[in-house]
Amino acid sequence: MSKKLLLKNAHIEGIRYFETYRKHGGYEAAEKALKMKPEEILEEVKTSGLRGRGGAGFPTGMKWSFLAKPEGVPRHLVVNADESEPGTFKDRYLMEFLPHLLIEGMLISSYTLGSNTSYIYIRGEYSWIPDILEEAIEEAKAAGFLGKNILGTGFDLEIYVQRGAGAYICGEETALLESLEGRRGNPRLKPPFPAVKGLWERPTVVNNVESIAAVVPIIEIGGAEYAKIGVGRSTGTKLISACGNINKPGVYEIDMTITVEEFIYSDEYCGGIPNGKKLKACIPGGSSVPIVPANLLLKTINGEPRYMNYESLADGGFATGTMMGSGGFIVLDEDQCVVNHTMTLARFYNHESCGQCTPCREGTGWMYKILKKIEKGEGKMQDIDLLWDIQRKIEGNTICPLGDAAAWPVAAAIRHFRDEFEWHVNNPELSQTQNYGIANYADPIPAVSNS
């Protein structure tokens, strides 16, 4: 059984309220942190090996250490709660049921970074959660954990909740900052990075909800103890949003030492696939990471078990692996159509493109049109090659990662399921009434000729 750090008290009735949260050890980590020097907390976070839980997996302590500290210039912490990645909902769970865990993490993080004004930028579709957060903020303020001279330390902190307007692109940190400043959420060119020139041109750290919440157990048990949980550079625990064709969808906390097979089939987690269906494929890190077929999901190309951690999921690169991403674990059974699924994702990314970069603005539209054509039984064999060519023109040629996020699902679908795409082209009428089923996987590593 995985060790619980973030969700250990999630089952307790009323845990979202200050009194109950406090009764079960809440804000003890904050009290401990406020007696430490900011640089000591930073070292604990570095020692813990905590990596950003929003998708990129960049070391949190290192990111904090980049924060510029010019004399007399305010600094800010911004929590990225614009959780809009299809298949990802773990941050929503934290904010809805454990809002004080996030606020405590923000208090510790803001104290470490020297931010006296911090923000939570929340996805517009989470319309009911800002009220929960604002109530928790008022409770914390009434108890002396927010506001002026917190616990007599001389440290001041105000936290504000800002609602987004439903744009996926605002999950990109610089687009988020643009929106927070009241402008259209278009990503900025980097450098300068937010740590140097962020919100209102001030040094700013932007972190994911789960990343900030994880600071609380790091201070509770110490960075060294936190680093012992997990394996290698995948330290601590990770929240996984499990959905799709599984018996037990939901949010699970894992310590990243379990195998993918155990996560899917164990009763402790997903509980297997309904109705005894076969596993066809999985997207383990949210819609933007490469889809992998069952034969490469449960084992690596070398035949070793694949584990639920950053390194193991990425084993083999994009040729045979994928990414941990945001932890949006989407399972597809044998009845699912990969062409239809890829088309749905392409439609999403085309709709959510901000339009600033031509490769993304035009490319996502054309990928959706071609996939729709193939899915309707009107495609030609050259359309598959055209799709491949378009995604190559998008990847790496945009200001922000949305272009890559749109290209990777298409590339992986063609790489691993080309036979299914060809079946749609060769069987236009049949493809409208039945699905292809389990793919006839080709060897993803073609043999190299010695001639």
Model-derived regions: residue spans:
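Short amphipathic, charge-patterned alpha-helical segments
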Residues: G105-S109, M256-P274
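Short acidic, glycine/serine/threonine-rich loops at helix termini
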Residues: A56, M62-W64, T88-D91, P130-E135, ...
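Histidine-anchored nucleotide/phosphate-binding helix
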Residues: L98-T112
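Conserved phosphate/anionic-ligand binding catalytic regions in large, soluble enzymes, centered on
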Residues: T47-L67, G166-E178, G182-R184, N350-E362, ...
